[in-house]
Amino acid sequence: MDRRRFIKGSMAMAAVCGTSGIASLFSQAAFAADSDIADGQTQRFDFSILQSMAHDLAQTAWRGAPRPLPDTLATMTPQAYNSIQYDAEKSLWHNVENRQLDAQFFHMGMGFRRRVRMFSVDPATHLAREIHFRPELFKYNDAGVDTKQLEGQSDLGFAGFRVFKAPELARRDVVSFLGASYFRAVDDTYQYGLSARGLAIDTYTDSKEEFPDFTAFWFDTVKPGATTFTVYALLDSASITGAYKFTIHCEKNQVIMDVENHLYARKDIKQLGIAPMTSMFSCGTNERRMCDTIHPQIHDSDRLSMWRGNGEWICRPLNNPQKLQFNAYTDNNPKGFGLLQLDRDFSHYQDIMGWYNKRPSLWVEPRNKWGKGTIGLMEIPTTGETLDNIVCFWQPEKAVKAGDEFAFQYRLYWSAQPPVHCPLARVMATRTGMGGFPEGWAPGEHYPEKWARRFAVDFVGGDLKAAAPKGIEPVITLSSGEAKQIEILYIEPIDGYRIQFDWYPTSDSTDPVDMRMYLRCQGDAISETWLYQYFPPAPDKRQYVDDRVMS
């Protein structure tokens, strides 16, 4: 949890086994034209070489924790770290004619202690040269860094990188890789939100969670006028190594990443998380427990959406539970899943600092057969917006043993809306509140005699209008308790239907209640499936208290 909190805070305000090559005057001159900042010797590089490097690295012992930073960097505050700026005149692709993309590097410091090596690659000759750290690549401003401590530290490395797109080539980045294997991207709002990771290990097991690191990146020199770039990454951790290829399309309204990885297990792994993503949900329309601020909602994402291998669409609203929860949803060759932020209305957040209405959704689209497994969702209690408390990933069914090799291909969409939608009626919003009284009498002069919890789920789209005259039937399944006072209400402002029901307990149990609902018309499903997890209060809390003072 400490690592997750640190990454969140830092983002708001990272030893490679080399492959030797023979340098030539021709290759040195070629690189000078493309990347003045690359100063290392040339070496052969392509994705197959990186795969061999990752494979061989897995046969050796993990090198352990990173070495200590110079004192001037290790003791930095977040404010000081954020004041360090990369010199835009020394950017990676600064000399590329008609460049539409450019890359800059993050400085080491604060909690970013793992050295990340950077290489520039000529894609025509498959020759790479390292870019070594040197203080003149940065502007230290008022960070208070003693640059004398950095002299001669060419092997210090960098913490990560970020990419800019024209016309904001040096001002507003669209892609960022920083910290462990975390990375993010934006849509056309330029507002960062949730994060992805290269890999998740033992997120919810009896072992300590492991955070693999990207320890080196190789950048193909971008073509003139191109808005797509390719970067390769070496992943390393105590349990596994990996070779990654990211082909990143920086489009007008979204960023799309084609990801290919080859993984090599060093040791047995209890829980391997593929295409993991990390987000934040503090409070929303369905969960008001932590909403005692001026903001009606606070979240990076409001739901987990799943398109199952059998074609079923599922909407699972997120929670901020009082106790950590982990749910696993079984599937076979999933078609896609993601953490979505679909409510883009500023008035629903009233936040001019976080701008949650501008934050992107993230959708994962598998590109090869993933087989059997589960989509894991972990929800961690949080008291505010500074902790990423939502984790989601694909876990293969097959147990991971030392020496196993895996290959996954998938596409990531960072956009306001996912690239695909359920063709049936979709869940627009979920609301919860006091139950046990007729709608329109909330709750009347006297509180209800019997305690209940009300749920209201709004559906829009699909064939709802055509189905209405024939009869819409909510199909509700509960793991415990009873659903009563079920109503179907037409909501004109959204041109959709609200399914409303009251949940009544049938025992004193406080175990989570799993709820499932979909809409049916004449025997056929006409909506995606709504899943929800409700946490009943203790029996002595199941009462209404009238705290009015009348005299």
From Swiss-Prot:
One of its GO terms (cellular component) is outer membrane-bounded periplasmic space. PROSITE patterns: TAT. It is found in: Periplasm. One of its GO terms (molecular function) is catalytic activity. Probably involved in the control of the structural glucose backbone of osmoregulated periplasmic glucans (OPGs). This is Glucans biosynthesis protein D. Residues 1-32 form the signal peptide. PANTHER family: GLUCANS BIOSYNTHESIS PROTEIN, GLUCANS BIOSYNTHESIS PROTEIN D. Pfam families: MdoG. Pathway: Glycan metabolism; osmoregulated periplasmic glucan (OPG) biosynthesis. Gene3D superfamilies: 2.70.98.10, Immunoglobulins. Predicted to be exported by the Tat system. The position of the signal peptide cleavage has not been experimentally proven. Belongs to the OpgD/OpgG family. Keywords: Periplasm, Signal. GO terms for biological process: beta-glucan biosynthetic process. SUPFAM superfamilies: E set domains, Galactose mutarotase-like.
